[in-house]
């Protein structure tokens, strides 16, 4: 019961933060940088009450990160002891059920992103945790970051069908 209340609070808090930080418009066609909000009738427990940030959407398919679920994995338990990312006691967020061996990071930077990195919305990039750990300009450039284990994925056309079925609401964010 306590875990359910915590999850609901976490979901509500995440949505409030996202709404406070962005101008939100409803959209019907998904694009990279948009949020997917799970419909309350969505039966898959991995996505129930979920909010997903699309980090990729093209003719080959879509990928995203669940932004409102934590995990019990600590970053320090996975990365080497000499990693620059293990000192602050962060835990990994649950990014989704696809490839739980993948470690990704969303990074908000001042000027220049790590290489390689893909811009999701203006100033917010997705990259591998290893790239972030090896980035020499980390302390000078990073405003904030969040790490994820796994991601969500859809085959070509699959996400569009789920949106038409009413499984997801699409929110356009303008950072």
For each feature predicted by the language model, list its residue ranges.
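Bacterial N-terminal signal peptides that target proteins for export
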Residues: 2-12
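Generic extreme N-terminus detector
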Residues: 4-6, 25, 61
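Bacterial N-terminal signal peptides
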Residues: 10-23
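A short aromatic-anchored loop/beta-hairpin motif
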Residues: 27-175
